[in-house]
């Protein structure tokens, strides 16, 4: 039980950047259900309490995959201003960080921050503003592909039976469309149930019958799935087809992905 809670706390810290005590409290108050715990802290506004380095809104996202495509890393490095984010020294510092993550296989952000403490202090003094390694992800897979959009959005996808061109297009789609899950099936039931209940309650409140409310909720759930499930989204390079049509036609298998965008509060859910 202790190990399970510890693992949940670690995962929640990675996804929210909150401290150990805040994560533990949220998990215990929600029967150790991580999805409910995250919803709980969203509603409580806990994520907005810390107006410090974790809330710097400028910066860069970088991604790198090793040559053998078995593992890669994604980082968000923050600064106070866009001016510093565009500085070559700052961007090179980001590249140095990602190289260290891959070389040492560092997955714990606290260890990385401690490892880079002196350099972070140096660059903070150099630029005269706060610098923060907001989040990192050491990502393992079978055939990884990465894509960076303007150093603002980064994606790594584990994809099988795909050409280089199609892998890039799918990664670009993920960057542009911001899905949270691969498929409807992969969305936790608690999220689907809560979302549907919101639509049903809204329809009933507006005087609809239960039957009509159910139909309305089904239609809205379809739109909801198109927004957050990769396979349900229309492909940005061919909007007559959904991603699921593209991958089925080509026998492509997308095992997992991760997406970072500068300024986000949470990790995208894989």
From Swiss-Prot:
One of the record's GO molecular function terms: translation elongation factor activity
Keyword presence, Lipoprotein: no
Region Involved in Mg(2+) ion dislocation from EF-Tu: start-end pairs: 81-84
Localisation: Cytoplasm
GO cellular component terms, semicolon-separated: cytoplasm
Keyword DNA-binding tagged: no
Gene3D superfamilies: 1.10.286.20, DNA helicase RuvA subunit, C-terminal domain, Elongation factor Ts, dimerisation domain
Keywords recorded for this protein, A-Z: Cytoplasm, Elongation factor, Protein biosynthesis
NCBIfam families, alphabetized: tsf (TIGR00116)
Function summary: Associates with the EF-Tu.GDP complex and induces the exchange of GDP to GTP. It remains bound to the aminoacyl-tRNA.EF-Tu.GTP complex up to the GTP hydrolysis stage on the ribosome.
Family assignment from sequence similarity: Belongs to the EF-Ts family.
Protein name per the record: Elongation factor Ts
